[in-house]
């Protein structure tokens, strides 16, 4: 018997194929997004519990060293309270089987939930730019949690440059986490009397 099946097919096929695999009592790893509706998502979760198998979604960035460094900083309050997060993820292949929310924004949300240890994020504002009916190529999202943390996410497929940047603002410093950097993915700017010193 297989220990795990990996599903990496067009998004529109995820629900039906995942349902078939889970009903066969196999552990399953699905390439994001899991499916296209909350209803289908809930049903797959229920199937996994019913068949006593595990259902995973592919969120690779939560395993990166730079993201886990920031998680440590937040946990230990090294620079005081975390006040805001800004995440920018731009330039990726335009897809017809899903939209930019499910393709890119889902990464930022998974990273932020992992870092702050909360899945109770609330959307306070969202701006979407369509390139065809019901398919979004660009989004800007404002989120908040129950600790008054301000969160901003901007994603777009079409961009002249590839951007994978998250900015974390603390009481005592600002951290830039840039996954595009090959060497120094983390840059820290410490607040000193209304100015910033890099260290």
Where in the sequence are the language-model features?
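Beta-loop-alpha module in the N-terminal Rossmann-like domain of NAD(P)-dependent dehydrogenases
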Residues: 1-47
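Alpha-helical elements of Rossmann-like donor-binding domains used by nucleotide-donor carbohydrate transfer enzymes
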Residues: 4, 16, 20, 43, ...
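A contiguous active-site-proximal alpha/beta segment in oxidoreductase catalytic domains
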Residues: 12, 35-94
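A short helix->loop->beta-strand "cap" motif at the edges of active sites that frequently abuts
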Residues: 24-26, 51-54, 148-149
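Hydrophobic residues in well-ordered beta-strands that form the structural core
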Residues: 30-31, 55-57, 177
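Mid-domain beta-loop-alpha active-site segment that forms a flexible
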Residues: 58-65, 91-122
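Contiguous beta-strand/loop segments that form the cofactor/metal-binding neighborhood of enzyme cores
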Residues: 106-184
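C-terminal helical cap and adjacent loop that interface with cofactors, partners, or active-site loops
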Residues: 195-199
């Amino acid at each position: 018997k297989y220990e795990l099946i990996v599903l990496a097919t067009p998004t529109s096929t995820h629900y039906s194929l995942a349902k078939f695999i889970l009903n066969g009592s196999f552990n399953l790893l699905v390439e994001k997004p899991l499916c296209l509706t909350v209803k289908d998502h809930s049903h797959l979760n229920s199937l996994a519990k019913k068949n006593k198998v595990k259902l995973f979604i592919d969120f690779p960035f939560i395993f990166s060293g730079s993201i886990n460094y920031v998680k440590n900083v937040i946990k230990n309050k090294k620079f005081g309270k975390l006040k805001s997060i800004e995440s920018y993820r731009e330039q990726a292949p335009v897809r017809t089987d899903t939209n930019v929310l499910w393709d890119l924004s889902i990464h930022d949300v998974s990273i932020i939930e992992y870092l702050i240890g909360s899945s109770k994020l609330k959307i306070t504002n969202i701006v979407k730019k369509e390139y065809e009916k019901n398919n979004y190529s660009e989004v800007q999202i404002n989120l908040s949690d129950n600790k008054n943390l301000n969160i901003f996410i901007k994603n777009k497929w079409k961009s002249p440059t590839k951007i994978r940047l998250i900015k974390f603002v603390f009481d005592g410093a600002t951290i830039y986490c840039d996954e595009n950097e090959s060497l120094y993915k983390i840059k820290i700017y410490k607040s000193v009397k209304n100015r910033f010193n890099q260290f």
